[in-house]
């Protein structure tokens, strides 16, 4: 199999033209995948609540189980990619599985059916994420790593923006009353989402190449923190702490509807978020190469805490809309930067495993995070919870604690 080494970056500033073709292939794949995914992912909680009448605790459970499924597979796909030295085809397999699962949402008539499809979709994400991130990391030098991950994230969010825009167009064309989501609108969005999903698999399979990694491949599929840098271990702990307060964005969508935004207005709100996220992802990723990952992550988490406080105190849907735009700053500052920090903290030969552990820490924390948020909002069983503001107060508190721990422990 032909292999390529990442080209060396020249000059004091990172240049887009020096990035390895794998970065562009991964970016294009994520762009197409997010067109597909974002067309339907934010409609799912509205479908569950508006059409099936599901309570927020169950919605949180569905999102949590889906993310936990992904997290468990992220662990072993990362370890397996280190063992085989093969990043590309594991990633292709994961994208393919998600593409196969999504069309079955068309037939969903219960929350259990939705859970099953989400399970398959996120299983695909779990398989692909760690080897894809390891491929990106291996295809760039340290001096441009933040830029590479920022560019990849920008492609991801650009696709999300377009996907949500297509969803908004479908809503406008298929619903005369958009205060609640209709079954016909949801099914139309599912059908249209299949096309970019298939194209994404083709782009990665054809456009990416394996990159040789210096050092000996792992001969055993072993998941262990034993030989990892202590700073990486501390970072994982802090990530878990933060994620426990970072419940599914489904709750923000439901909060927007609860505060009076229509389905179409909610899509425009999401487009505002993704536009800000897309514009800032690349520059903030490159900024982390200059000022340091640590400062940017802390700044992003502080922004998250302030935005979540705003969600808690919001009185109208327009407040949610404005705050969700600022939420894009948090995402842009932290998503790519955190992944670049992982690459900084471990050697090349451990990166697949490290990304598996990193993504698993987030995913395993997502289940309790979303269940806690749903329970705080509407309760479980005979308990009615504390109301719609409660999960956002909790998220703001956890973000503050994570900032303090990160500042003290990860240097």
Give names to the regions the model predicted.
Residues 61-79, 271-284:
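Central cavity-lining transmembrane alpha-helices of secondary-active solute carriers
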Residues 117-158, 341:
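Cytoplasmic helix-loop-helix junction between adjacent transmembrane helices
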Residues 12-71, 232-269:
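Helix-loop boundary and gating motifs at the non-cytosolic
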Residues 172, 194-215, 402-410:
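C-terminal membrane-cytosol helix-exit motif in multi-pass small-molecule transporters
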Residues 2-20, 209-239:
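Juxtamembrane intracellular "pre-TM" segments in multi-pass secondary transporters
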